[in-house]
Amino acid sequence: MISELFQTMHKARFSGIRIVPENSPSLQQSCVRAFVESVRQTKTQGDSEERLMQLQFLPAPLLTPILDRMCRYPELRDMLRDELTDPVLFMKLFNGYAPDYDTLEKCLREAARAGGRPAVLRDLANNYCDMLRTELRSALRKGETHGQQPRIRARVLESLRFGDYLYEAGWCRCGAEVLTLTQELIVLLLPHASRALQMECLVRLLRAQIGACMNARAAATVQRLLAFVVEIPAVGESGATTLLPLVKAYLQLGCYYYHVQDYDRCHQWALRALASAADGDAPAKGDVIDVLQLIALFCIAKERHDLGNMLISQAVQRARTEYGSLHRKYADVLQQYGFVLLRMNAILPAITAFTECLDITGRVYGLLSPHAVVLEGYLAHCLYLRSHTTGRFDMALRHAETALELASQLMPTSRRVRQQLEHTRDLILRGPDNRRDTKESQPSRERDFHSFTLHEIKEKFFELDSSFERDGLACSG
C-alpha cells in the first residue's frame, strides 16, 4: 500500500498540477500522516509489525518524516526503538544524501523513553557489530575480495563515522568495538588504498579507548600509532601521499599520555600538535580547539593556572564561534572548561559551566545519555565542595542520586563509574570535611579574555614553555 501511495505522490508532484490551496499539506505529508495513523490504529491488532517492515524499502528522505511523525505518539515509542536499533534502517538515515541529524537525534531521544530501555545507541551498536562480523566472515570464507573493494571501502567509511558518532554521544566503549571491527575490514582493502584509513582508524580508536578507560587496549593502539607516525617522513620522501591526519595523531598521543599521567610525553606531543596546527577549513579549526584543550589540561596539571585558564578560554570562544552555542562539540569544550575550573578550585564558575553543558547535551541527546551521568556526577561533587560554604548538602545529594540512577539504567556493568559515584555520595552523606579550605579561587572569566589568533597563542605558549624547561632543570639539579 505504502509504495503505491508514494508512486502516486511522485506522479502528482511532477505533473505540475495543483488542485489544493497553497497552504494545505503536501501529498507526502498527507501520506506520512495517514500511514502513521494506520500504524497507531492497528498496533493492538498484531499486524503493525508487518506494515513497518516496508519501511526498509523506502529511501531516507521518506523514512525521516515517518519516524519524525511517530515521535508524537508515546504509544509508538517501543516500535520506534525497534526500528532505530535495526542497523540497516538506521544507516539509511545516517548515510542519507543530506543527513538530518536534528531529526535523527530527536527520534533517538524519544526512543530512549521507551519503557525501561533507554540504551538505544548501545543496542544499535551491538546489532551493527553483529552485522560487521557477519560480513567479515562472509568475505574471509569467499577468500576473494578484489571485486568487493568499493563495497568494503564504503562500509569502512561508514563505520569510521558511526564509531566517531558513538564516541561523541558518550558511548565510548561501543565506539571502540565498532572501530576495532573496522580495522579488520581495512585489512581486506588493497595496501595502497588502506594506509591513510588505517591511521585514521587508529586515531579514532585511541580516542574512544581513552574515553572508555580501556587502558590496556589503548596502550597497544598507541604502539601501532607510533609506528605509523615514525614511518610517515619516509613515505613523504618516496613521493607517496602524505594526506594523513598528523595533527590528530599527535593530539591523541598527547591525550593518552595525559590520561596515564605521563606529563613529560604529554608535553612533547602537545608541542608537536600545536606546531602542526593551522587555522583553515572547519576540520582544521576543530583541531586547533582540541589542541588548545590538551595544552590547557597540561598547564593545569603543572599548576600553571593562569596560562591554562587563558588557553581553555580561547578554546571555548573558538568553539562557540565555530559550532554555535547548542552544538555537541561546544558542549564537549564546555565540559573541559568546567573541569579546568574545578581543578583551579573555582567552584561556582565550574557549577555554571557544567550546568550549561548539561542543558546543551540534554537538548542534543536527551537526559538519558552517558553524558548526563558524567555531568550529574561533576555537579554533585562541585555542589558538595560548595556546601562547605553554604551549609546545604541536599542539592549535591540529589545530583549524586540522579547520576547513580542513570548509571544503573545505562551502564549497569560499569563498576568503575558506579564506584566513583558511590564515593561521591558517601562524601556528601558524611557531611562537611573540617580539614578542607573553604576559600575558593576567582580566576578571570572566559569572556574577559579577548580572542587571540593562532599565531599569538603559539608565541605566548612557546615563550612560556621555556619556563617549563627551566623548572624541570631546577628540579633535576
Residue spans of the language-model regions?
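Residue-level detector of the short coil/turn that links helix A to helix B
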Residues: G116, G170-R173, C213, Q261, ...
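Helix N-cap/loop-to-helix boundary motif
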Residues: H146-R153, L190-L197, A234-L244, D281-G286, ...
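"A position-specific structural signal for the A-helix of alpha-solenoid helical repeats
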Residues: A154-L157, R161, Y165, L197, ...
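Amphipathic alpha-helical segments of tetratricopeptide repeats
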Residues: Q183-L190, R224-G236, R272-D279, S313-T321, ...
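Single-residue signature of alpha-solenoid repeat helices
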Residues: G175-V178, A218, C266, G308, ...
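Cullin-RING E3 adaptor/co-adaptor recruitment helices
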Residues: M1-E177, L181-I186
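Eukaryotic alpha-helical solenoid repeat scaffolds
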Residues: H371-G477
